[in-house]
Amino acid sequence: MNTKTPFIDQPLNSLFFWERRPKGEIGIEVEIEGGPWPDHQATNWIPHVDNSLRNGGIEYVIRQPVLRERVGAALEVLNKHLADSDQVFSYRTSVHVHVNVQDLTLRQWVNYIALFCIFEELLVNVVGPERAGNKFCLRFKDADASMRLLRQGIIDETLPHLLNGDLKYASCNLRATASHGTLEFRAMRGNLEVPFIKAWVETLLALKDAAKEAKDPSVFVQEMSFLGPMEFARKYLPANMIADGVLAQEDILSNSMYEGARLVQDVAYCIDWGNPPPVVIPNEVENPAPDWERVFHDLAGRDLRGIEE
């Protein structure tokens, strides 16, 4: 018998099949109401009609994902493009950030989700407090079935088949991994404030970078218990306005992060991450050559008369 990489350590690009394999790290969708909008397109931005919006609402989507250091420049292009348009950011609008995860293994992807979950409530309070509990932006605490599904998919090794439409309208959209090779973060309120969006992207990428280095998701649960929520937050959140907003929530910070860690526990301890079972491959050739002697002997014993050509 031969073995191959355990299921949990397989790269996502071997579990999912995407039409596009972009090199960029970040995709952004900005929903705006108001207008009128320019007749021509901004460089690397495509306008889409969004029927969930009102008053001439439109969604601008980055055409090609950009590297982290180009996020600010891309947003400035859109800002300049819309400078003469009336921009209205109502409760219906939001900013969605897609983080490319095609470079991750399944283990790293689970690490990323777990680490985000610990901070999720506090982060949503900073970037989109009015979206907390929104049915199109459900947090893990609002839909804890997502964690149970994730756990079962890891144990049964069926996770790619479980990422269905039920997960789309979440603060952290897991379904986007199956469809686009990203994790989509939907919590940010509608805005086109470049420093604010840049800080949000920086935060999401810092969590991804940490997830790539972690041994498994249980590390985060154990480390938070050892360091305490405040020091844990200081360690993993980059020093920016998003982190400042999280750390300012002293009255709820500990309870919120411990609740996030409790949600993560079922996933963090669902398998033995140190010794995941390998996938066994039989030595036999998948399609062995026919035994022609046996075939001819079998045919010789049959009455083939009357069989049409």
What are these regions (language model features)?
Residues K168, S179-D216:
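Beta-strand-rich recognition/accessory modules
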Residues E25-G27, V110-N191:
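Aromatic/basic-lined ligand-recognition segments
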Residues M1-D86:
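Terminal catalytic/cofactor-binding subdomain
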Residues R70-L78, Q102-V127, E193-K208, V246-I252:
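Helical (often loop-to-helix) elements that flank the catalytic cores of nucleotide-handling enzymes
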Residues Y236-W273:
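Acidic, carboxylate-rich catalytic segments that either coordinate divalent cations
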Residues E286-N287, R294-G306:
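A cross-taxon signal for low-complexity, glycine/charged-rich
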Residues V88-L104, T182-R186:
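Histidine-centered divalent-metal-coordination microenvironment in nucleic-acid enzymes
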